Amino acid sequence: MHISVYERDRGFVIEKLLQGEFDYVDTADEVFEADFFRYIGAGGILKKLAESYPSPRKKHDVPVWLALGSSISMRLHGAEAFNKYEYVIRCGGMMNAFGPDLGSKFADDDNGDIKIACNGFNNKNAYNRETPCHPDYLRKYFRDTDAGRAEKWYNTEVAKLFKKRRAYNKQGLFIGDATYIFVPDNPKYECSSKLLFDEHNHPVDPNKLTKKELKTGKYQWHRCYKLVTLLHIYPELDCFLIAGFRLLPGKASELPAFYELLDSFVDAVGKGVVKRVILDRGFLDGQRIGHVKKTHGIDVLIPVRKNMDIYKDAIGLVDEVEFCDYVEPSKAKPNKKTKAKPKTIKKREAKRRRTNNK
């Protein structure tokens, strides 16, 4: 049995980093990732996701669950390029979670480097594999996946699975949000928009600025998308869950897209999951808010700012009303039930009434 012993030596590590003797640096926790994949693997969550995923392939040389798991692992490591997949597998916990069927890690006897041996899935490997599947397969697989179908899959099928796993709490508190995602200035980014932003990353209209203002350096052009999200909030855990999303061109309005997203989410998970939605003034639309309340029974909360007309209206109404100290009303004393009259008295009164009526 081969046993490897590691000693913590920060000085040695820093020295090697300064000398450039490293291939890949990662901040992810291998143990946490392994526990995470054991949970979604043993619970059948990963296979359930694979069954409903809108795969672009009719024949799968690599299981869909492995492609999804590999993508999730890369997201946990913050890796965006698929050519980093080899490093993610090497230092992550996915291999440990799924055991020898996926592959095995071992230390090289000559130099002590960590090696990976994978069997693969299609029996077409002429050489030893160091990853469960080729990184280029993942790149092509997710590139060929229809973006609209993948978006709908997350907003419906994944949302249903979250509900089945009791991911939504009883408070039913959600937040609607819209943010810009900047990408490199390449027109090949489909449906992207090129907008002018100020120093706080707020879009501005270039037609409303003078040439002098444009030359101050406070404004920059960015190619971007707009991400509209429906977030489920867990106040006691200080975290949130992305319950649904829409990816739009940067110049598109988030207002109609969000309410369509909310309608489809409620249709998928049913009424009662969403009880309150907190929005900013960008989502202010009386007709749509009324529809959400009447159709789904959802309360919409929009914080008021001092520069909003509704705030000024409220302050104006306050000035016209006279206020006085609140006095709690006294509680009325309960009426005491009268005692029933004795039978003898009842007979005398009845006899007296008969006499008076004659």
Regions found by a protein language model. Give the residues of each.
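Active-site-proximal, Lys/Arg-enriched surface segment
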Residues: 135-235
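Short, positively charged, Gly/Tyr-enriched micro-motifs
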Residues: 59-154, 235-236
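An internal, acidic/charged active-site-proximal segment
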Residues: 247-358
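Phosphate/oxyanion-binding active-site loops and adjacent basic polyanion-contact surfaces
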Residues: 63, 81-82, 222, 250-259
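Basic, short loop/linker segments at the boundary and entry of helix-turn-helix/winged-helix-like folds
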Residues: 22-72
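Double-stranded DNA-binding cores of transcription factors and transposases
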Residues: 3-15, 61-70
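Short, conserved catalytic/metal-binding motifs centered on acidic residues
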Residues: 70, 85-86, 134, 138, ...
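Gly-rich Lys/Arg/Thr-decorated short loops/hinges at beta-loop-alpha junctions or inter-strand turns
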Residues: 239-245
